[in-house]
């Protein structure tokens, strides 16, 4: 299955639950950013950086955050951080696997599977235009904006 057809539950910027697929956004450029976990320091900073730059991003792209967290977790994260973009729940990591961001990771010598922080720009037809892999949170949204406004 191609990533355009994968359907995931998510919440819109008002917190309403919907089923989404990339093909739902045909005609719009999309920033699809994958992050490991709601309410962790790096993920919160990245989400807040996107939130704080939505006035600059919205005319150019639709921003969508994706993590393996469930809808309940996303809703709490969205409310706590006042997030103003779509969050998708990829609990079975179908979309993460389609974008090759579901990877073996290691912490304190323990290996586990998780999201490799990555961002993808999809064009109006849902095709990959640009990718940022192994993202460092600091300055990332500025880098994305720099690319979008060049």
Model-derived regions, located:
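Chalcogenol-based redox active-site neighborhoods
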Residues: 1-150
């Amino acid at each position: 299955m191609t990533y355009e057809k994968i359907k995931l539950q998510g919440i819109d910027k008002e917190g309403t639950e919907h089923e989404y697929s990339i093909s739902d956004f045909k005609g719009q450029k999309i920033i699809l950013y994958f992050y490991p976990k709601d309410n962790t320091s790096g993920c919160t900073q990245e989400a807040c950086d996107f939130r704080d730059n939505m006035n600059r991003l919205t005319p150019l792209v639709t921003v969508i955050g994706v993590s393996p967290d469930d809808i309940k977790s996303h809703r709490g994260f969205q409310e706590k951080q006042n997030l103003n973009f779509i969050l998708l729940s990829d609990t079975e990591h179908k979309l993460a696997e389609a974008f090759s961001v579901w990877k073996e990771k290691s912490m304190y010598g323990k290996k586990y599977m998780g999201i490799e922080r990555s961002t993808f720009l999809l064009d109006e037809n849902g095709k990959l235009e640009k990718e940022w892999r192994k993202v460092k949170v600091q300055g990332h949204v500025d880098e994305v904006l720099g690319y979008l406004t060049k």
